[in-house]
């Protein structure tokens, strides 16, 4: 698995409940751009429209070598390739519990197919974000103390 891009902000802003791997319907020039890691997953989300899942907000820059006539929209919606049962299950869960679906990681699998790991998430409140920052700082301090204790 070759990691192309990761959405680190999603881990901070959301509580991740369930993850799933999905394929992407891409153009040839977009696949070439992915191989050069010219992608940004920062503010992406998944919307289910008429029984199909679409990924919005992913920015895939086109290559400099592309012809001026053929320049696809860098932020266009991209279709996700999922099984119908998985899609229906997630659609019901997301609408029932007011959850969101976001992309976490974009990568090439062993067969060189572009895949995205999507997650069913619940938004964190401000105090939850502060709590996770405190826990992170505390863990960092504990690790530093342990390292210092065993080193000297």
Swiss-Prot record:
Record's GO cellular component terms: cytosol
CDD domains membership: SmpB (cd09294)
Highest taxon of source: Bacteria
Keywords: Cytoplasm, RNA-binding
Presence of keyword Ligase: no
Chief place where the protein resides: cytoplasm
MF (Gene Ontology): RNA binding
SUPFAM superfamilies: Small protein B (SmpB)
UniProt subcellular location: Cytoplasm
Pfam family, one: SmpB
GO biological process: trans-translation
Role according to the record: Required for rescue of stalled ribosomes mediated by trans-translation. Binds to transfer-messenger RNA (tmRNA), required for stable association of tmRNA with ribosomes. tmRNA and SmpB together mimic tRNA shape, replacing the anticodon stem-loop with SmpB. tmRNA is encoded by the ssrA gene; the 2 termini fold to resemble tRNA(Ala) and it encodes a 'tag peptide', a short internal open reading frame. During trans-translation Ala-aminoacylated tmRNA acts like a tRNA, entering the A-site of stalled ribosomes, displacing the stalled mRNA.
Family, as annotated: Belongs to the SmpB family.
NCBIfam families listed in its UniProt record: PRK05422.1 (NF003843), smpB (TIGR00086)
Name of this chain's protein: SsrA-binding protein
Source organism of this protein record: Helicobacter pylori (strain Shi470)
């Amino acid at each position: 698995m070759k990691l192309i891009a990761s959405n680190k902000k999603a881990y901070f802003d959301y509580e991740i409940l369930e993850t799933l791997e999905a394929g992407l319907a891409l153009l040839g020039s977009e696949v070439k751009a992915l191989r050069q890691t010219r992608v940004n997953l920062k503010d992406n989300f998944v919307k289910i429209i008429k029984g199909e899942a679409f990924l919005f907000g992913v920015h895939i820059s086109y290559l400099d070598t592309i012809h001026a006539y053929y320049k696809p929209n860098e932020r266009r919606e991209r279709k996700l390739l999922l099984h119908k049962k998985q899609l229906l299950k997630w659609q019901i869960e997301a609408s029932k519990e007011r959850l969101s679906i976001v992309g976490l990681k974009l990568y090439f699998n062993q067969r060189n197919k572009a895949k995205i790991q999507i997650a069913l998430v619940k938004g964190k409140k401000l105090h939850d974000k502060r709590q996770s920052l405190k826990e992170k700082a505390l863990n960092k301090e504990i690790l530093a103390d342990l390292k210092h204790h065993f080193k000297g």
